[in-house]
């Protein structure tokens, strides 16, 4: 059985190494440049969460990944899934509105 590579970075930051920079280095080290993204649509599945909650990916992280993918010729877009339970994310229109409220 082949072993998988595991990539890790800690969450400690310094003035010269913030979390966005660490994420970018991690993605590059994992080999994102070895994938042919030229003119390909690339879905970035993220969790938008309900308005007022804090368990969603902050926009600056998604923006950094989008920038990296565009540099590689990709056509990235963000996506999420509606929920089965009732709430603001149970239909597409309200879901998009709650996403905008979270940034």
Role assignments for model-derived ranges:
Residues 1-103:
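N-terminal and secondary-structure boundary signal
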């Amino acid at each position: 059985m082949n072993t998988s590579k595991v990539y890790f970075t800690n969450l400690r930051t310094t003035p010269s190494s913030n979390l966005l920079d660490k994420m970018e280095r991690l993605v590059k080290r994992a080999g994102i440049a070895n994938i042919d993204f030229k003119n390909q649509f690339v879905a970035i599945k993220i969790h938008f969460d309900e308005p007022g909650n804090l368990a969603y990916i902050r926009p600056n992280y998604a923006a950094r990944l989008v920038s990296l993918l565009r540099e590689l010729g990709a056509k990235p877009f963000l996506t999420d899934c509606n929920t089965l339970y009732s709430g603001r994310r149970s239909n597409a229109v309200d879901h998009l509105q709650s996403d905008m409220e979270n940034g």
